[in-house]
Regions:
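C-terminal, active-site-flanking charged/polar segments
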Residues: 128, 324, 328-329, 336-354, ...
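Right-handed parallel beta-helix/beta-spiral solenoid domain characteristic of secreted/periplasmic
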Residues: 422-488, 510-511, 515, 520
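Right-handed parallel beta-helix/beta-solenoid
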Residues: 355-394
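Right-handed parallel beta-helix
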Residues: 460-465, 499-511, 533-547, 557-572, ...
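Compositionally biased, low-complexity/repeat regions
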Residues: 1-371
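N-terminal extracellular ligand-recognition/capping segment immediately after the signal peptide
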Residues: 100, 379-386, 390-447, 467
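Surface beta-loop-beta hairpin patches that serve as ligand-binding interfaces in beta-rich domains
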Residues: 339-362, 643-735
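Acidic/polar low-complexity surface segments
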Residues: 363-366, 439-448, 474-482, 507-532, ...
Length: 735
């Protein structure tokens, strides 16, 4: 009970009447007292909740753990400051609440295989499958005690078994490997007394009811699941396990869908007919729908979906009323004489490392208190962005702040020019758990077709949760028109945008991705800033190159702030940040926990921390700013550096081994191509100076806040604690 008048209402009515006649001084006094009473009661209630691990505050978890003998893993790193958001997030990884809550139960189940899977999930947050490798050894059967399911030889006719070779689900016998699985050098797997914990670090994200992309270059019957038109492997929507003792199988883990399991093997098809899709995957992880003239979807039944290898688009042609699907590449082929007339909608799961770049995940939404929200979608009165902009323009009285919110994961193809009046605020954002795509087409032959934004004094523009492909985003000062040449800068003034925020968005590097994963326009920037002083903020986003053009270098440089993002210029030799002419950008850069692929040429770096620069960095003003706990390639010209690589290894290496050490600590990624699941993920062979080189011993780069080194160290320590005596247990990264 937190009512402000709780004490005043306890007074007899006669005193309240007298108090009202005198203007309510007694009521005001009791409201002040009630406020303090409420604070004390809430504190008492919070103290009671702190007695239980399920309801206690995060700072109480270590104390409850100490009461039951829980010991933190010091190899994972020291706890952070709980008063700061970064330290608070780190402490939740170092001392997981779920592990503390279940530690007594773990001790009772010590030595069981299923416990190792629970440990992986509760300690590190990674789904896992535990495997005992001695069961997969090939050996001679004893005549007295034959075990027909063990010790077999490899069956080269078993295509399904060979398809699983090397994975966590293989049943193919192996010869013995004498190397230990937890060796610090080269690891082995198949040995007596060896168990492995296969962990899946990539998270799966859903895409619901989005249009498939028609690849007209290959044929009007060829489609991709990805709305941008490139290959995307489909992933399993992991099903919960049925019991605590159950060992996870392929349906319980966020693993990529392979072609063989995607086919239904429970029922034999008629002679000469292919197998249709399995109920384990279709409808649950994947679905395809055809739309009618009115846009109403009709789902294709799984009996009409044929799993196929479509690495060659024209290799397989489905029969009439059927559709071929390749889950490995994310491709769809319809019969050539039965093409979709009104569109195709698909739902599927894809994988990525973290919640960045937009998608169907929860994120924090914000807007001004006075903002008016215009909802756009195929089922809404406003169908397009232009309809929403016109509704805002014609609104009487016109709101100073507007939010255009996309209510579905539709693809919007519009030509947009936004011009904000003084003090106006406009936000284009996706609704929660939606993934809209804005595809900018080549409408005009004589002019560029980027998403163009101008604004006057005090105006603000925000993008949140969108994927933009086909063209880039151009922010331009109000003093020049979009038709003007960049060779004729106007006089700087205050008549300009105040700030631009790009949050949880993807501005596709190279504008769009071809079917083979290569960018279509690798030399074109995703973000152009022409003659504007707007403060640009980029948060949890993926962008291509950034180009700027300044009015007059006698004024202050344009501020750009980048956090938890990827800036991808396609290769380390191209410019990730530079002027439109390829010279030094007149920019004051602040960057944290980000990965930059490409060269950076900027006027100043005020602060760069926990960041990977994959290309040479050139800063004009070296006497101002700092670069700390980052990777900066040799040959870079930066402000003073602190605890950066390869500077640290050069200081400690022998003179003859300097170059060897410099090459050793160079960041290695699993993939640097946008659209792949392991995009910008540090590889297992990457040097520890990079994977634990941040200021809190986490990894450098965009995935710093995942705290993967701390998760892995915690899990290794718990494996040593709960593995049966005489056995070796190790971690194997499945992706």
């Amino acid at each position: 009970m937190n009512k402000a008048d709780r004490l005043y209402e306890l007074l007899p009515a006669v005193y309240r009447m007298v108090d009202e006649e005198q203007g309510g001084p007694l009521r005001g006094l009791l409201q002040v007292i009630s406020e303090q009473v409420n604070i004390i009661e809430n504190d008492i209630s919070r103290l009671y909740d702190n007695w239980f691990i399920e309801t206690c505050d995060d700072w109480v978890v270590p104390y409850i753990g100490e009461l039951i003998g829980y010991e933190p893993v010091h190899e994972a790193g020291e706890p952070g400051d709980p008063q700061q958001s970064e330290g608070h997030a780190l402490n939740k990884i170092l001392i997981p609440r779920r592990e503390v809550a279940n530690v007594i139960g773990y001790r009772r189940r010590k030595g069981t295989l299923a416990l190792l899977e629970l440990l992986a999930n509760n300690v590190s947050g990674w789904p896992a499958r535990a495997v005992e490798f001695y069961k997969l050894l090939g050996w001679t059967q004893p005549l007295n005690h034959p075990r027909l399911r063990r010790g077999q030889h490899s069956n080269l006719v078993d295509g399904a078994g060979l398809d699983l070779l090397g994975s966590a689900f293989t049943q193919t016998p192996h010869t013995i490997d004498v190397r230990r699985i937890n060796s610090q050098r080269t690891t082995g797997r198949y040995n007596i007394g060896t168990a492995a914990l296969f962990v899946w670090r990539l998270k799966t994200y859903s895409v619901t009811g989005t249009p498939a992309y028609c690849l007209e270059d290959e044929g009007p019957e060829c489609y991709t699941f990805n709305a941008l038109g490139h290959d995307t492997p489909l992933y399993t929507f992991a099903q919960p396990e049925t019991s605590p003792t159950h060992i996870a199988d392929q349906l319980n883990l966020p693993a990529p869908i392979r072609r063989r399991p995607f086919a239904d093997h429970t029922v034999e098809p008629p002679p000469g007919k292919p197998r249709h899709a399995s109920a384990d995957y279709y409808d649950g992880s994947v679905s395809i729908s055809l739309t009618d003239r009115d846009g109403k979807p009709t789902e294709i039944p799984r009996e009409n979906v044929i799993p196929a290898n479509l690495s060659n688009w024209h290799r397989y042609r489905p029969e009439r009323d059927h559709v071929a699907v390749d889950p490995v590449l994310g491709r769809i082929v319809f019969p050539s004489n039965q093409k979709p007339r009104h569109g195709v909608l698909v739902s599927y799961q894809y994988a990525f490392s973290a919640d960045i770049g937009g998608g169907e995940y929860e994120r924090q939404l914000s807007e001004p208190v006075s903002a008016h929200i215009f909802r756009v979608g195929r089922k809404e009165p406003l169908k397009t962005i232009k309809d929403a902009l016109d509704a805002w323009k014609n609104q009487k009285p016109k709101a100073r702040a507007a939010v255009i919110e996309f209510q579905d994961s539709e693809v919007y193809t519009e030509q947009l020019n936004v011009n904000l009046l003084p003090g106006e605020y406009l936000q284009l954002r996706a609704a929660q758990r939606k993934r809209p795509v804005l595809r900018l087409l080549d409408y005009l032959a004589s002019l560029p077709d980027a998403l163009r934004v101008q604004g006057q004094q005090g105006s603000r523009f925000v993008l949140d949760g969108l994927t933009i492909g086909g063209r880039g985003l151009k922010i331009k000062g109000q003093e020049t028109n979009f038709d003007d040449s960049i060779e004729m800068p106007a006089t700087p003034g205050d008549n300009d945008l105040c700030d631009v925020t790009i949050r949880h968005c993807t501005l596709v590097p190279g504008w769009s991705v071809q079917g083979d994963g290569e960018p279509q326009r690798p030399n074109d920037p995703s973000l152009e800033l022409e003659y504007t002083r707007a403060c640009v903020r980029i948060e949890h986003s993926i962008l291509g190159a950034i180009r700027t053009e300044a009015h007059d270098e006698a004024s202050e440089p344009q501020p750009i702030q980048i956090t938890d993002s990827i800036i991808d210029a396609i290769s380390e030799d191209r410019m990730a940040l530079a002027s439109l002419r390829g010279a030094i950008a007149y920019v004051a850069l602040n960057i944290a926990r980000s990965t930059v692929i490409g060269r950076v040429q900027t006027h100043a770096i005020e602060l760069a921390e926990n960041t990977i620069f994959n290309g040479i960095v050139t800063v004009a003003r070296r006497g101002h700013g700092c670069v700390r706990f980052s990777y900066v390639p040799e040959g870079s010209r930066t402000p003073r550096r602190y605890e950066c690589q390869p500077d640290l290894v050069k200081q400690t290496a022998d003179q003859d081994a300097v170059q060897v050490q410099v090459d050793r600590v160079r960041p290695v990624f699993n993939s640097v191509r946008y659209g792949t699941p392991s995009y910008c993920q540090l590889a297992d062979r990457c040097a520890q100076e990079i994977t634990r080189g941040a200021d809190d011993e986490s990894e450098m780069g965009v995935f710093h806040d995942l705290f993967q080194p701390q998760r892995a160290a915690n899990l290794r320590a718990r494996l040593d604690e709960y593995t049966p005596a005489g056995m070796d247990a190790g971690i194997v990264y499945a992706n």
